[in-house]
Amino acid sequence: MKKFLFSLCLLSSTVLASPQSELTERLNQNAGFEAGFTQKVLSPEGDVLMQGEGDVKILRPNLFRWHTQTPDENLLVTDGNTLWYYNPFVEQVTLMGLEKATTQTPFVLLTRNKASDWDNYSVSQNGDAFTVSPKADSAVKSEFIVRIQENGKVTGFSVVEQDGQRSDFDFTKFEAKKPAKDNFTFAIPDGVDIDDQR
């Protein structure tokens, strides 16, 4: 009988947990991770517009390195204050303040967990898929679907734009470990154009 009641209590607490608190709990299981990714961009009709791949490193809070290798190389990296976007093809680096640059993207939820980050979103859950939707009065217009297992392993995410275009990112070689902090700095190469928007 005790075992049954204990199981019932566990079940009740699981049922009562909101999708937002469940997502927060899963995200909080890892202080950081590294993974490879594949990307597929689909038109509203489902046609493949682009495919790519790269790797990502996240160290919570606020540190990330997103390196797209194909089809066109670019690098997005932040030290928690400055966000660098480097495009080697056009030989340009853009510098932005992290807070300003990430205010209107739900991707920030993967990289930190401030209570105020959730103010613009509502969350629904379907198994291991959590749909993070902008509230009606939010400046954010895209929907974010993060796929994360109970143990905190992020298997990927999707971004659905207002016009129906969709970007799917699937993570491979996921490692739940803290990447070294030296991954989150950027030395500007000689000779590149600098667009400082901080």
Curated annotation (Swiss-Prot):
State the Pfam families in the record.
LolA
Q: Does the keyword Protein transport apply?
A: yes
Q: What name is this protein filed under?
A: Outer-membrane lipoprotein carrier protein
In which compartments does the protein localize? Periplasm
Q: What cellular component GO annotations does this protein have? A: outer membrane-bounded periplasmic space
Question: Its family?
Answer: Belongs to the LolA family.
Q: Which UniProt keywords apply?
A: Chaperone, Periplasm, Protein transport, Signal, Transport
What organism is recorded for this protein? Aliivibrio fischeri (strain ATCC 700601 / ES114)
Give the main localization category.
periplasm
Tell me the Gene3D superfamilies matching this sequence: Lipoprotein localisation LolA/LolB/LppX (2.50.20.10)
Q: Which gene encodes it?
A: lolA
